[in-house]
């Protein structure tokens, strides 16, 4: 006897820096719970983000921008990802970093526009008409070949369909006869035909014929209920960038050069403004007809100070365009020089005319108690066990250096405790890894003391 173990097909995901964030952690009235949904503290910032989520859901925020400003390690990216979690999968969320716009192949403004279009969804409602039932009659109607000769051509196909509620006789196009032959449809089969596309699907043999043969490989299906003619609404979610790409890549020809071109790695090309305008016209027509609905999503640009003056100017135009998403910026800079200039100093490295258009959410440094709670959350997410004094020591290290450094010490400390033959991470393990791995402040202090020993 052979016994096999069935392996799980559930996808295992890597534990990332923000795996523990599940939402904004707000109560029914929109007030922030101190520690909920993976977020700790930052009550004012989370409540402000909650108002933004409500505005996005009610479609009153499109074309506006938000800035998350605060020191490094204060949860700006975590709040942006929490907004994405609150909005759900149906609202497009496109994260990018400021330095992504710089490319040798395409312009900076093109990269920005691509991400803008990725952040705008289109929900298309399509009503599909389906004829479904058991085949009672299948008669191809032949006519003389109009091209002459002795052959005959099929002008149409008469097919009878039966359900539990009634019967219908249909006159179909000859192209559907080819599809019926491919599916090997016979009288007594249960099929459905899509009226819009002419697609035919054989579902199986009607179960009224189940007693015909002893040996049978057929799959028997019950007689369909309801009417023969049914209408079904199908909803598709696409982004405007998907439509741009689909129309920007025409299929190549059948000659050798075209086929060789398809085999080679295609170079990234820009999508023209003319094509985008044509797609916008079609989208607007669909919206006017009620076929489609525009879903403004969220574009999250981290490290916004990495953009230069040209891209900031382009952002003005993009934010004021009729089709624009909600844009969330994040930065950890104070007053600094705007990239692309030599002497223009501005708050957060953003031009003042763009800052004037933004709603700014401030994030504050965490207290020692908040840091301890965040470290506990991370340890729980990573499946690590720590003694209470180890948590206290880590929060002290986080206060003196950074929260990121304290969280990064968790995994090496777990390895150290395994080497020492324990399951729980102790304060001694934390001290050991703290002495082995330097943080940025201690490293820079060491560098300034031994500056003459390093190469210039």
Swiss-Prot record:
Keywords: Activator, ATP-binding, Cell cycle, Cell division, Chromatin regulator, DNA damage, DNA recombination, DNA repair, Helicase, Hydrolase, Nucleotide-binding, Nucleus, Transcription, Transcription regulation. Its main location: nucleus. It is found in: Nucleus. Signal peptide: none annotated. The keyword Coiled coil does not apply. GO terms for biological process: box C/D snoRNP assembly; cell division; chromatin remodeling; DNA recombination; DNA repair; DNA repair-dependent chromatin remodeling; mitotic spindle assembly; negative regulation of JNK cascade. Its EC number is 3.6.4.12. It comes from the Eukaryota. GO terms for cellular component: brahma complex; Ino80 complex; NuA4 histone acetyltransferase complex; nucleus; R2TP complex; Swr1 complex. InterPro entries: AAA+_ATPase, P-loop_NTPase, RuvB-like, RuvB-like_C, RuvBL1/2_DNA/RNA_bd_dom, TIP49_P-loop. Disruption phenotype: Death at first larval instar. ATP binds at residues 70-77. It catalyses: ATP + H2O = ADP + phosphate + H(+). SMART domains: AAA. Higher expression occurs in primordia of mesoderm, anterior and posterior midgut and cephalic furrow early in gastrulation, as well as in endoderm and mesoderm lineages during germ band extension. Later in development expression is only maintained in endoderm cells. Expressed in thoracic and abdominal segment neural precursors of all embryonic chordotonal organs. One of its GO terms (molecular function) is DNA helicase activity. Forms homohexameric rings. May form a dodecamer with rept made of two stacked hexameric rings. Component of the chromatin remodeling Ino80 complex. Interacts with Myc and rept. Belongs to the RuvB family. Acts as a transcriptional coactivator in Wg signaling caused by altered arm signaling. Pont and rept interfere antagonistically with nuclear arm signaling function, and are required to enhance or reduce arm activity, respectively. Also an essential cofactor for the normal function of Myc; required for cellular proliferation and growth. Proposed core component of the chromatin remodeling Ino80 complex which is involved in transcriptional regulation, DNA replication and probably DNA repair. This is RuvB-like helicase 1. The lineage of its organism: Eukaryota, Metazoa, Ecdysozoa, Arthropoda, Hexapoda.
């Amino acid at each position: 006897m052979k016994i096999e173990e069935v392996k799980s097909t559930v996808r295992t995901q890597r534990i990332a820096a923000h795996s523990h964030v599940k939402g904004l952690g707000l109560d029914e009235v929109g007030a922030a719970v101190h520690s909920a949904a993976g977020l700790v503290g930052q009550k004012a910032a989370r409540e402000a983000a909650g108002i933004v989520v409500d505005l996005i859901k009610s479609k009153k925020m499109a074309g506006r921008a938000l800035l998350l400003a605060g020191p490094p390690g204060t949860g700006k990216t975590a709040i942006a990802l929490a907004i994405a979690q609150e909005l759900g999968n149906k609202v497009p969320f496109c994260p990018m970093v400021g330095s992504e716009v710089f490319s040798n192949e395409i312009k900076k403004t093109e990269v920005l526009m691509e991400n803008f279009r990725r952040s705008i969804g289109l929900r298309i409602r399509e009503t599909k008409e389906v004829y479904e039932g058991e085949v009672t009659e299948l008669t191809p109607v032949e006519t003389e070949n109009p091209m002459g000769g002795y052959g005959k051509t099929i002008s149409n196909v008469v097919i009878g369909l039966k359900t539990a509620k009634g019967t219908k006789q249909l006159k179909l196009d000859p192209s559907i006869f080819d599809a019926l032959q491919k599916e090997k449809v016979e009288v007594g089969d249960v099929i459905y035909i899509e009226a819009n596309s002419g697609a035919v699907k054989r579902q199986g043999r009607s179960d009224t014929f189940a007693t015909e043969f002893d040996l049978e490989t057929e799959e028997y299906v019950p007689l369909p209920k309801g009417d023969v003619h049914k209408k079904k609404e199908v909803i598709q979610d696409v982004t405007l960038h998907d439509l741009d790409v689909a129309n920007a890549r025409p299929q190549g020809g059948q000659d050798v050069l075209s086929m060789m071109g398809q085999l080679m790695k295609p170079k990234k090309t820009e999508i023209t403004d003319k094509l985008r305008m044509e797609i916008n016209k079609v989208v607007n027509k669909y919206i006017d007809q009620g076929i489609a609905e525009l879903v403004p999503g969220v574009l999250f640009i981290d490290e916004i100070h990495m953009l230069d003056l040209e891209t900031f100017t382009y952002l003005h135009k993009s934010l004021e365009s009729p089709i624009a998403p909600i844009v969330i910026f994040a930065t950890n800079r104070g007053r600094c020089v705007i990239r692309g200039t030599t002497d223009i100093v501005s708050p957060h490295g953003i031009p003042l005319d763009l800052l004037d258009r933004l709603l700014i959410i401030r994030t504050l440094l965490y207290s020692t108690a908040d840091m301890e709670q965040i470290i506990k959350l991370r340890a729980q997410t990573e499946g690590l066990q720590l003694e209470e004094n180890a948590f206290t020591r880590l929060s002290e290290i986080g206060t003196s250096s950074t929260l990121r450094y304290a969280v990064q010490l968790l995994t090496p400390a777990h390895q150290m405790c395994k080497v020492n033959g324990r399951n729980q991470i102790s304060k001694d393990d934390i001290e050991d890894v703290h002495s082995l791995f330097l943080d940025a402040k201690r490293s820079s202090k060491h560098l300034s003391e031994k500056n003459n020993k390093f190469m210039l």
